[in-house]
Structures are given as C-alpha cells and as structure tokens.
Amino acid sequence: MARYIGPKCRLARREGVDLELKSGVRPSESKCNMNAAPGQHGGRRGRLSDYGGQLREKQKLKRTYGVLERQFRNYYKKAVQQKGSTGENLLILLEQRLDNVVYRMGYGSTRAEARQLVSHGAIEVNGQRVTIASYQVQAEDIVSVREQSRKQIRIQSALEIAKQRGFVDWIEVDAAKMSGQFKRVPERIDLSADINESLVVELYSK
C-alpha cells in the first residue's frame, strides 16, 4: 500500500482530532473543520459500531505516526511479546521511532518532514548517521542534526516553532547545538489521552 500524500486536513477531519500532520504555525482548528467529516457535504458523523470504533482508533494511530498497515501489525506483534500492557507497549514502540523522536525534538515541523530528514541522512544517533526512520531510539541516546545539515532553513524554522510549543518531558534539547537526549522511555501518562489503544488491541485480538 502506498503512503498517503493527499490533503492532511482530510485525514484529521476523518478522525475528528488533530493528528499533528500540519506544521503548527497556526492551530489546526483554524485550518481544518474537525467537527465535520471530509468531503463537500461532510456532515455530522454517524454512530459507529464497536468494530467501526476499533477500526477508527487504529487508523488514527497509524496516521498520527505515519505507519503503514504491515509495519503497524508488526509493532503490535512485538508489543504482544513484551511484558506489561500490550496497548501501552504499542504506543511506546511508536514513540521510540527515530522519525518521531526527531519530530519531538523539533528538527522537523511534522513527522513526515522528520522522516524525510532521516532518510536524507541529516540525522545522527550517538554520533553515527542513521537513515532508517523506524530505528528504535533507546533511553539516553543522543539525537542530533548533522553539522552539514544545520543551515537548512526548514530545520531552523521547525526548531523555532518547537521552542514556542515546548518540548515533552522525556527529551532534552539544546536548540543552539541542534542536539538532544532521549532521556527516558515515556510512560502512558505522558502520552495523548485522545488515543484509546485498548480498542486497537481488541481489534487485533479477534
């Protein structure tokens, strides 16, 4: 399945929440009407069945982190094999993706832009260039912009937006050096309350 490259507002309106697919220069609510489904005649959303709700939650999570179905299913299988809550394990695995950490550190204004920075070789982990977006970042890893990429306007602009927005508690960023530390693996309480990961577990458990 190909990666979606169409209007980002369409995806956000489909799920009814901000999926952080836009740059954050303006609030998503000012760009996308979250109260209406996509389409010219998108009206109120109908009541979903249990299965429909589970499917929507899976789509919301996949679209937030920019992961396709096969890879998402592999994350679920890995989460099942780990100790603890499968749903929480799944969220943490997604949070540890390098493209997500690059986004959290403010080097990319969106996860899609962060993924592109990784694939283009602009990012280092512990001083070594890594070009795999799905690379799993571990606690205390140092994630930096490579020296030859630090003059890119898009990275500088993204960092300015990130400084205004603020950084999450589990990372520490030195914006001047374009370097940050993934201090710890986040806990469930740190992550979005808009996600109901138990519905995703129910869907895949059938």
Curated annotation (Swiss-Prot):
SUPFAM superfamilies: Alpha-L RNA-binding motif (SSF55174). Residues 27-47 are annotated as: Disordered. Residues 96-158 form the S4 RNA-binding domain. It comes from the Bacteria. The keyword Cytoplasm does not apply. GO terms for biological process: ribosomal small subunit biogenesis; translation. One of its GO terms (cellular component) is small ribosomal subunit. Keywords: Ribonucleoprotein, Ribosomal protein, RNA-binding, rRNA-binding. One of its GO terms (molecular function) is structural constituent of ribosome. Pfam families: Ribosomal_S4 (PF00163), S4 (PF01479). SMART domains: Ribosomal_S4 (SM01390), S4 (SM00363). Part of the 30S ribosomal subunit. Contacts protein S5. The interaction surface between S4 and S5 is involved in control of translational fidelity. Belongs to the universal ribosomal protein uS4 family. One of the primary rRNA binding proteins, it binds directly to 16S rRNA where it nucleates assembly of the body of the 30S subunit. NCBIfam families: PRK05327.1, rpsD_bact. This is Small ribosomal subunit protein uS4. It comes from Dichelobacter nodosus (strain VCS1703A). The gene is rpsD.
